[in-house]
Structure formats: C-alpha cells, structure tokens
Amino acid sequence: MGRAYQNRKESMAKTSDMKAKVYSRYGREIYVSAKSGGVDPTANLALRSLIERAKKDQVPGHVIDKALDKAKGGGGEDYSPARYEGYGPGGSMALIECLTDNPNRTFGDVRMAFTKTKCKIGTQGTVSHMFDHVAIFVFAHEDEDAVLEALMDADVDVSEIENDNGMLTVFTPNTEYFKAKQALVEAFGELEFEVDEIQFIPQSYTTISAEDMDMFDKFMAMLNDLDDVQNVYHNVDLG
C-alpha cells in the first residue's frame, strides 16, 4: 500500500481562495458529524478526530465553533453523503466523495466535470473495487513490533505496517478505525499523528502522458471548485 498518503487527495491549500474552500468543507463535515452524533467531542469520537484533523490543517477555531453552534441549533441543511466514480484522462480512475443537500444538483455538477474533460462517469462499483477503503495512521515510533503487539492485543485487524526511518504507517480496514486509534492511544499515550483518517487507496498507480496530465489538472480543478465535493481520490502517479 506504499505511498498511501502521497496521492491521497488533491492539495487544496495553495492560495487564500483554496484555503477558504478547505475551511468550508471542514465546516460542513464537522456540522454533519455533530448534528448526527452530538456536539460533544468526548462522546462523539468521529467529531473529535475530525476537529483534530481540522486543527492540523490550520482551520481557524471560529470556523469549527460556527459549525458546532449551527449543529446545536438543530436546524440548518440536511446533508447526505454521495460518492461518484469513473475514468479520468489517460485511463486513470477517480473516486469523488461529496456531502450534499441536493443530490440531483451535485450529480449534475460532477458529471459536468467528467464531460468537459472528456472523462467518463460510471455507475457504483465501476472503479471503486480497484481502491482499498482503509484507515491510516502515520506517527513517529521506533518500535514497530511493540505497535503491532498493542494492536493485536486489542484484536485490531492490521493490514500492514510500514517503517520509514522511525515514521510508522499503520493500515487497517476502515471499519477498524476507532478501535485501532483507541488501542494506539491507550498503549502509547497521546501520539502526534501526521495522518489519522479513512481514505481510499488505489491498489495500483498509473502514469499518464503530459497531454493527459494537462487534462487531469483541469479535471481536478473543476471538481475542487464544487462546494459539495469533500475528497477526490485517484490513481495517477504524481511522482
């Protein structure tokens, strides 16, 4: 599963405009998590992890507080998750995760990004079977065996552990996320996670031509411009 977090999703924080989009997307995700599971991060583990990740990505506190306050109010929009998939430039594959209050609008917007870049949107399962849905934890630790033992003692299904000069990357099935994180924290204290989330990781990467890369960049830009898009995963080798 190497290079898991190198291509995990398109960078969205290169300009102030992009940062605003990152804040908006975190705000929406925090609102949805708090509304469905409660606004107390100590009781809502999904919300707690999301807030921690938002802070790591330098999302301002007022953005987080606004989303929580909105969820406390009980009103507001009703967002539901949606996932689209298909083939991108050069035969590449893409998965697009959305949160939407209007599925018809969102599908039309995503389909337009595919159509305008000569890509092909597919039905559910078209390319998702070529991605692994995994929980990933990246943190500094010298003893790989101790980490594996702690996870196994907690009955966590560990898919793989990679060690890059003392920086460990732990992969588990996505359904093991909370159990794995709890086991790591209980065994080693409050670890400083560089990556701590659930992602879709391609089973293999593809190299595309310079011409296709230009179209791929346009494809990614169009998707990232859509307010409803939360994450874009692909199998293009950007190295």
From Swiss-Prot:
Keyword terms: Cytoplasm, DNA-binding, Transcription, Transcription regulation
Keyword DNA-binding appears in the UniProt entry: yes
GO terms for cellular component: cytosol
The keyword Transcription regulation is annotated on this UniProt entry: yes
Subcellular location field: Cytoplasm
Protein's GO biological process: regulation of DNA-templated transcription
Short name of any one Pfam family annotated for the protein: Transcrip_reg
Any one Gene Ontology molecular-function term assigned to this protein's record: DNA binding
Main location: cytoplasm
Source superkingdom: Bacteria
Xref: HAMAP family: Transcrip_reg_TACO1
Family: Belongs to the TACO1 family.
Protein name (Swiss-Prot/TrEMBL): Probable transcriptional regulatory protein ABO_1803
Annotated source species: Alcanivorax borkumensis (strain ATCC 700651 / DSM 11573 / NCIMB 13689 / SK2)
